Amino acid sequence: MNKVTRAAVILCLFSGPVTAEDLDLNFDFRFRYEYTDDSGKADTRNRNRIRTRLGAKYSASEKLDLFVRFATAEENTTSGNQTLGTGFTVSDIGMDQMYLKYDLSKNTDLLFGKMKNPFFKPNKSELIFDGDYNPKGLAFTLKHGEIFSNIGYIKFDENPLQTIDLRSLQVGWSKNINDLTKAKISFAIYDFDKLNEFSPSVITFNGKNFGNSLDDNGNYLYDFSLKNLSLEIKTSLMSMPATFFLDMVKNSDADQNDSGFQSGLSLVISDKWKFTYLYKDIESDSTFGALTHSDFGGGGTNHKGHQFNLSYPVTKRFSVDVVWFDNKKKMT
């Protein structure tokens, strides 16, 4: 006879009728034409892709907020893009975010669920985490004057045989240097637990490896204990709003190919055009490849090169963007 024991803690949020005035709604839609010329492949690739997201915020009390967002999805951890094909299939919609935010005090918040990434990333850096990645777990955000901190406990899989945890701590300082300049700097530790006990086939959303080194059994060769230094300076350059940014990572659990960085500049030109340039070099085991930027170098690690962004707001709610990647895959 098998014996099954189960324990659960259940949080129920009850509400009466909800009207439109009770909800803070947000929506975005993006169409993207994508052209890829990979010298390692015989053919170029052309794709038409869409991403749409619909979210809502409900304030249950002065201290408790509920956030829900649905998005197009292909079971991809780091992308909400849907590729338009000729199969006339229906696009998938998934739960992109669903979390509670509770104000423990004036300067301390608790987040629980599948949440918006709570960690500071200079100029929305995607060196470690893709912008579409929404972690699942528990997080605290704290502020005290010019000091801020973020603490997270992220879960990757509910199966006890494949459980991987990400424990994270970020401490930072934000300072208004003068009327035109603001600086923000942080140091973070992202500690993945037991990744090197598994192969990508049981960890990543599609079972593929994203640039990290593997051992003879097909498991990850190294675990990942990441040290991350981030810097962002907002100022004025020739009367134009400018942002300088630097993001660096080192995996102390790897013996080699353990470092990565990106650095760049963002300029707002004539109140309309926005131009961003960055250079990135991300070695094979500097970070967990399945979570880093899914577009740079085709996704994953072991890439270096340039990225150019040019954005023009046609109206307040409609913009046109051009992004150019000139990347090289490192040979090992």
Predicted regions mapped to residue ranges:
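Short, solvent-exposed loop/turn segments at secondary-structure junctions
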Residues: 76-79, 119-122, 286
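Solvent-exposed loop/turn segments at secondary-structure junctions
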Residues: 31, 72-76, 116-119, 156-158
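Signature for the C-terminal beta-barrel architecture of outer-membrane proteins
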Residues: 103-110, 118-272, 279, 320, ...
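Beta-barrel outer-membrane channel/assembly domains of diderm bacteria
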Residues: 2-110, 138-151, 175-179, 223, ...
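Flexible, surface-exposed loop regions and adjacent strand-edge segments
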Residues: 42-48, 83-88, 127-133, 201-206, ...
